Structure formats: C-alpha cells, structure tokens
C-alpha cells in the first residue's frame, strides 16, 4: 500500500520548551479508493517563527544519540533506510518524516501527561532522546512490528529537563497506525484505527471521549 506524506507548517512559532497548551497540532489520516494512505498534520504554534529545516538522510548515514548535558557515549545507529523529514532547530530532531520503506513517524506535544524514565549514564548506549526518536524510527524500521520488538532494548529520555514530553504517531505501509506514549516510564502502544491524533490528554482519553459524540 502506497504511503504519501503531506507536511503543513501553518503558523509556526517557538520550540517545545516554551509552548503552551493552547497551541494544538492535529494529525489526520486519509485512505483513497485505490488503497493509498495519506498522513497529514498541522504544526500550530502562535508566537514567533521556529527554526525549521528540511532534512534528507541517506542510507548508511550514522548518527549518535544526543544525551543530556552533552554527555558522551550515546547510542549509535546507521540508517538502514533513507528518509526525509521536517527538522526542528537541528537535523537530528525530526518532527515529522517518512522513509523509503513507506513508514512514517511524527511527534506531537504531550505536556503534563507523559513521563520518561530518568537518564542513567550507565545505560547511555541504550538511550534515545524524545526529540530524536522519530529520526531513529525512520532510520531503522519498515513496519510497526519491527519497531515494537526493538523498543524492548531502548530507553526514551528527556534531553532537556525544561521541555515538556511528546507522544508519537507511527504509520506503516500497510496502513496500520499506532500511537506511542510513555507514561510513568512505561511505553504504551495504542492501535489507532481512527487515524487522528492531537496533543494531551492521553490517547485513551481521546478515544473514550469519542463516545460522547457517537449519536451526533
């Protein structure tokens, strides 16, 4: 199944460190009659222009995970798949992108509800920052099942303790989509047949809230 990406950078403003809950990104998924899948999103901020960059990463490119306080010894990974994306401030921090296998990944603002495991220097080689997670996903995986298996061996951490948490939307070439949230240090995968994701509260809350509108 073909996967196509649309990037919408609408009223963009400041980074996650200083954003407030009134700024809400929205992701949607459309399916065409021929079986194609289109994932799209807005990036809705409101204050000042963000330093966004378009990023193209080829197969074979090696990155090192950025750790808190510029600590050394971060996990290294070499791209199995080339990918393109919209970066925030630097090339490693991909907000939204897709790889050549047809898998797409995106992050969305998730303040007050998410909580990662604390950074442990002894586990630096297994740690990936929340803002670098999309890049790691796009570089390494073609399907959600592959990603889920690999998640058992990594720790998602907060690079900057001042920043709020994020959650992620992953869509693979089959059209399957999941939402990933880290709450109280635990990684949660939620199938997302609705194909819609916004910011906080948690995905289960949004799913339950739909019951209030089923009769409209």
Residue ranges, per PLM feature:
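Bacterial N-terminal signal peptides that target proteins for export
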Residues: 1-9
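Hydrophobic helical h-region of N-terminal Sec-dependent signal peptides
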Residues: 8-16
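Alpha/propeptide regions of enzymes that mature by internal proteolysis
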Residues: 123-155
